[in-house]
């Protein structure tokens, strides 16, 4: 009887171990979404190709480079799309997406664009929160994430920092709040939006209104 019980226990344990080993075993391997830890003082990211390369480089550094990474950015003229407009939402696949802590971000595009900003969800590729207006955040505020997009992830024309190639004071870019907070943790209006809260001051300097030239990266 003891031998039979021991064998049964071994079978149960083996099944459980197999089930548990199906998930990511280290930070980064299951990551399909992050905010960039790398920053930019201007809105010139080298266009979509430069932004995509930044996403891939950061993902590779944490062991998640074996995926197709795309920056969540809208542009008015996309060379890869016949110089037609491209919406950020059309670049990132259909989900689901998980952050670097293994936490589900959204199951699909509709769920993603129904979200509000959240400092515990919208983290960088190392799982670290982005400085913002959340309680206990270090300074300076850097929660303005460049998107060039409306709340539904489509192009906001005229707000793309010259399709992410401009560092001019004459161009602007639309940004979202990664933590979902405005000044004094205000969540009214668009301030809670993760992808379309307001425009930056201009594309020559991403800092004055609470940014650091960060972007969102998604694996397709």
What are these regions (language model features)?
Residues 13-16:
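C-terminal motif of bacterial Sec signal peptides marking the signal peptidase cleavage site
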């Amino acid at each position: 009887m003891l031998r039979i019980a021991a064998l049964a226990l071994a079978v149960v344990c083996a099944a459980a171990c197999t089930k548990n080993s199906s998930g990511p075993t280290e930070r980064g391997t299951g990551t399909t979404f992050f905010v960039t830890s790398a920053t930019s003082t201007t809105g010139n990211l080298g266009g979509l190709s430069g932004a995509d390369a930044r996403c891939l480089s950061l993902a590779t550094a944490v062991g998640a480079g074996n995926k197709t990474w795309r920056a969540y950015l809208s542009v008015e003229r996309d060379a890869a799309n016949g110089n037609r407009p491209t919406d950020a939402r059309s670049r990132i696949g259909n989900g689901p997406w998980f952050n670097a802590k293994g936490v589900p971000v959204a199951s699909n595009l509709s769920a993603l664009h129904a979200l509000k900003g959240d400092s515990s969800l919208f983290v960088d590729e190392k799982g670290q929160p982005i400085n913002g207006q959340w309680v206990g955040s270090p300074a300076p505020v850097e929660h303005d994430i460049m998107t060039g997009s409306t709340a539904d992830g489509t192009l906001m024309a005229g707000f793309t920092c010259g399709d992410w190639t401009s560092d001019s004071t004459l161009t602007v870019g639309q940004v979202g709040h990664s933590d979902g907070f405005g000044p004094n943790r205000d969540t009214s209006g668009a301030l809670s939006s993760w992808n379309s809260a307001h425009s930056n001051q201009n594309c020559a300097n991403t800092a004055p209104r609470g940014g650091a030239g960060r972007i969102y990266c998604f694996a397709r």
